[in-house]
Curated annotation (Swiss-Prot):
Keywords: Transferase. The keyword Transferase applies. Belongs to the GST superfamily. Sigma family. This is Glutathione S-transferase. PANTHER family: GLUTATHIONE S-TRANSFERASE, HEMATOPOIETIC PROSTAGLANDIN D SYNTHASE. Residues 40-117 form the GST N-terminal domain. Transmembrane segments: none annotated. Residues 1-33 have a biased composition (Low complexity). GO terms for molecular function: glutathione transferase activity. Conjugation of reduced glutathione to a wide number of exogenous and endogenous hydrophobic electrophiles.
Length: 241
């Protein structure tokens, strides 16, 4: 094809041609060009464990987002605690502003890396699953952290015989109904959240809770096999939980 001649400049007093579709207009005379978008800075504060922060680390890894992974020691925590929004962790600092609530932080990161739904209705489907997983985790935690041995033994019977099977059977069926995922028939942050929090739940009950739930195991294995998350797992600090 022959080369096209360059467009003639506008005549004196004539308005310049409009920019092509999708093209940013040039700055007006004497006006500075638009600034480059500011890159967000992220810092995650938590103890040197996976637990509640690991889903957040998974989401950072999935999105290839750089962040500072601050692992606070027990000795450092008393001095740091008053500086946190609610005196607890995990806490996420974004551009110098600190926020708490691990589920809300995970949802924020999921939106950032494109793992949410395409509509409010789809987001609701994902949120329902994540909140159900969190309810499940809390029921395990209540028993795991019970200080009285005799009471704990009684609670463990109900937990193992009723609570754990109830939640896992429901979630197992959810995966079967969603083409191997926990929502929307595709990878969402519900899958990533579950894979990230599983080690903590296993730690609290001292066993692999997915032994009899192959569909859920498939979700976790698929997430952990994603290249950026696999790379994170290989390099992360080795901790008991």
């Amino acid at each position: 094809m022959a080369d096209e001649a360059p467009a003639a400049p506008p005549a004196e007093g004539e308005a310049p041609a409009a920019p092509a579709e999708g093209e940013a207009p040039p700055p007006a005379e004497g006006e500075a060009p638009p600034a480059e978008p500011v890159k967000n800075t992220y810092t995650l504060f938590y103890f040197n464990v996976k637990a509640l922060a690991e889903p957040l680390r998974y989401l950072f890894a999935y999105g290839g987002i750089e962040y500072e992974d601050v692992r606070v020691t027990r000795d450092e925590w008393p001095a740091l605690k008053p500086t946190m929004p609610m005196g607890q962790m995990p806490v996420l600092e974004v551009n110098g502003k600190r926020v708490h609530q691990s589920i809300s932080m995970a949802r924020f990161l999921a939106k950032t890396v494109g793992l949410c739904g395409a509509t409010p209705w789809e987001d609701l489907q994902v949120d329902i699953v994540v909140d159900t997983i969190n309810d499940f985790r809390l029921k395990i935690a209540v028993v795991s952290y019970e200080p009285e041995d005799e009471i704990k033994e009684k609670k463990l019977v109900t937990l193992n015989n009723e609570v754990i099977p109830f939640y896992l059977e429901k979630l197992e069926q959810t995966v079967k109904d969603n083409d191997g995922h926990l929502a929307l028939n595709k990878l969402t942050w519900a899958d990533v959240y579950f894979a990230g929090i599983l080690d903590y739940m296993n730690y609290m009950v001292k066993r692999d809770i997915l032994e009899q739930y192959p569909a859920l195991r498939g979700v976790v294995d698929s997430v952990n096999a994603l290249e950026p998350i696999k790379a994170w797992i290989e390099k992360r600090p080795q901790t008991e939980v």
